[in-house]
Design a protein with these regions (language model features):
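S-adenosyl-L-methionine-dependent methyltransferase catalytic core, i.e., the SAM/SAH-binding region
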Residues: 1-322
Length: 322
């Protein structure tokens, strides 16, 4: 079994995120991305031995490492759940815990996943083309790279990676796999670099970064699941409950920003209407008008935190959409 000491992960925006939840003893809290348990443990510490904490992850190794911390927090009903965060509605219903006081999600890939070559997430480490957050799922990065059509590859590179050279890279991958399928991460990373104009020179990041992000999102259906999590999670909060989400790239951040904005101002009436007639009322307030970002000190300690953004929503007592 993986131990906490083995799960090398530096949490991002740890204290700002848990501060935003206003954790109190006796409350009910859900960590949708347990990882190695750093955020869950800080929530548990502030619960002072009272309440319910649900830690969700679809990665067995991450969940095992998280739950090793449980013995340090006697009195808390700490529940591990192996699942996808998009199923938050079903999870909360099945646990029969009713509405909750706080929900958080850290959408980044963990340091452990990136640094473990066998998981296939990193373009810097030689490993199998996998990228599954849940190893029990069937779709792998190799399946995407070797079996998707040229147009499908261009779409995911463009839409999920915001890659300017999506078409050219897709052409190169399709041409190359005709003679030999891609099986290793560094092999694909080098090919992507070779297919880019100027071989990626002048880039402020590795030429393969955006394409690897795109493939990972496709393999794990991350963006579809995120929209479901946000919409269902907001409706599972008690009045005054908080939802805190850490994103790591512009696609995620736009989805979080829009979901929170729509929940705060859902009215669909034309702007020239003097009063609202659609009947859609606000579900709460966006606490972070601008996202909270890591300090320079945190970035120096953990460079992977550089692109992170924290947004927070607070629920009101309107029950209209529940």
């Amino acid at each position: 079994m993986l131990k906490v000491s083995d799960f090398d992960h530096i949490p991002v925006l740890l204290y700002p995120t848990v501060d935003a939840l206003n954790v109190r003893p006796g409350g009910i809290y859900v960590d949708c991305t347990a990882g190695g348990g750093s955020h869950s443990a800080e929530i548990a510490r502030r619960m002072k031995g009272q309440g319910i904490l649900v830690s969700i992850d679809k990665d067995d190794a991450a969940l095992a490492a998280c739950m090793e911390r449980k013995e340090d927090f006697a009195g808390i009903d700490w529940m591990p759940v192996k699942s996808d965060y998009k199923d938050i509605d079903d999870i909360i219903r099945s646990l029969k815990i009713g509405k909750v006081d706080g929900i958080m999600a850290d959408l980044g890939v963990s340091s452990y996943q990136l640094d473990t070559a066998e998981r296939g997430f990193s373009y810097m480490k030689n490993g199998p083309l996998d990228m599954r957050m849940d190893p029990d799922e069937w779709l792998t990065a190799a399946e995407v790279v070797n079996r998707y059509s040229r147009d499908e590859l261009e779409r995911i590179f463009r839409d999920y990676g915001e890659e300017h050279h999506a078409g050219r890279i897709a052409d190169g991958i399709v041409e190359r796999r005709r003679t030999k399928p891609f099986t290793r991460t560094t092999e694909l990373a080098q090919a992507i670099k070779d297919y880019m104009p100027g071989h990626g020179r002048g880039e402020d990041q590795h030429p393969a970064k955006r394409c690897f992000q795109a493939i990972r999102i496709e393999v794990n259906h991350e963006l579809d699941g995120l929209e479901t999590l946000l919409n269902d999670g907001i409706r599972k909060l008690k009045p005054g409950g908080r939802f805190a989400v850490i994103s790591f790239h512009s696609l995620e951040d736009r989805i979080v920003k829009e979901a929170f904005r729509s929940a705060e101002s859902p009215c669909t009436c034309p702007r020239d209407f003097p009063v609202c007639v659609c009947g859609k009322k606000s579900l709460g307030t966006v606490i972070t008008k601008k996202p909270i970002e890591p300090t320079e000190e945190e970035i120096e300690i953990n460079p992977r935190s550089r692109s992170s953004k924290l947004r927070v929503f607070e629920r009101n007592d309107n029950e209209q959409y529940n």
